[in-house]
Amino acid sequence: VKRIWQFALLCLLLSALLVSPSFACQSLNRQGVLNLWDTGPLTLDPAISADMSSHIYITQIFSGLVRLDDELNIVPDIAESLPEESPDGKTFTFHLRQGVKFQNGREVKAADFKYSWERACDPATGSTTAATYLGDIVGAEDMLAGRTQGISGVEVLDDYTLRVTIDAPKAYFLDKLAYPTAFVVDRANVESGQYWWRQPDGTGPFKLKEWTPEQRLVLERSQIYYGEPAKLEQIVYLLSGESMGRYEKGETDVTLVSTSYIDEASDEASPLHLQLAITPELSLYYIGFNTAKPPFDDVNIRRAFCLAVDKQHIVKVILRDMVSEADGILPPGMPGYNESVAGLTYDLEKAKELIAASKYKDASNLPPITLTSGGSGNSIPAYLGAIIQDWQQNLGVNVTVRQLEMEDFLYNLNEEKDEMFMLGWIADYPDPHNFLDILFHTGSENNVFEYSSPSLDALLDQAAIEQNRAVRLALYQQAEQMVVDDAPCLPLFHGANYILVKPYVKNYELNTLGIPDLSKVYIENG
């Protein structure tokens, strides 16, 4: 399943909200407490989580051997240092910090990581991310397939030493271990019951204090965290109402900015301007085509649908330049980003020629088409409405939109996939592999397009193990152009985060993956 889900789609849906543009000055904040709005996590199980909203909580409660710092460099976490690497680049030896404890007081040992990773790869766990983030480890694929009971490439040398062997030298392997699937969990906690994750026993800077779904979730500072203690006493998530409205009333301290507020927030004369923070995001928002289902099993139809959408109008007029138009797959700031990629830009004549060249010959011969998106309510985002209108006016094709609650959307995407779907992807680590290989390689868990290209697979496989950085990035640029030309998706735009932060909230920052490090945040009450 995909990484972005709730957070990405939530950001997009917020862009369509219209609310009153008057902000209260008062705050209900008290010292040491950060108040936030959210819809809440789908799960707090690191092995199961595949959505951004859940990740934000999990990264506060759990931790792994390594993590990404603010500049997205890989740094030690529970490991006391970066691992010793063998000359062939395939074996990594980790030395764990001593004294790291789960919330129940038990010390974390190397065997806990072996258990956690093998649990994630156990077919009975049902992880949709283990193959992607742990699959490079020797023996992981065998366990995922049910052929073995353990991962042969993970060896416990002693209580504080773990040796990991991967199938080939890969520059991005350590980055993958910063993903929640590789976080450590307490076996006794997991075996306490099916919904153990509602009372998680983690190793992160915060612990779960209370959780009433659709009402309130509270994180509390861990008193036994091995790193620098969190500055906040509590983080209170309000799981109902509407983000901008709660911010306006002083009930929350941070909010996403909708398009209806961007002019006011960007105006230097506005009091909101000093509360505005903008951070780029390594992301891609797109419409995916089910290439195994008519009519999108025909590349001419896929390309025609791409060419018939006026993305420039959507970005500039509807989304108010809060995002940047996407011609390719890789976002600006990602290694290998190619600003000269030849995208399928707005061209109605070419679109009509492609439909005529397709096996359908004419748009009137296309089967019914449904586009599925995640969300709630009766209205769809304005930008999606504009895309639907472009297809109707420019191609004469009527597309039905089906909007589903997130859990239903995920089920639909994996079990009953419609012809098209609205999605996004936020990077997990700063490497083109995280977009091109994970999304488009044949058989990838996250290849929701049912797309397969042997020539692309060969290029991606070559890039994955190439040790010369310049050559490697050039291979990924070739792969990106192949994907754009074959059009398993319609790239729409690359995102950015526009947030309002109350003046008394300090150090609240989102990295380019869209995740805040809440352990650094503090409240400055006068």
Language model feature labels by segment:
Residues 83, 315, 397-414, 437-503, ...:
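Extracytoplasmic/peripheral linker and loop segments enriched in polar/acidic and small residues
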Residues 209-220, 236-293, 316:
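Extracellular/periplasmic solute-recognition and catalytic clefts
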Residues 297-389, 393, 478, 525:
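Append "and occasionally in soluble cytosolic enzymes with long acidic Gly/Pro-rich linkers
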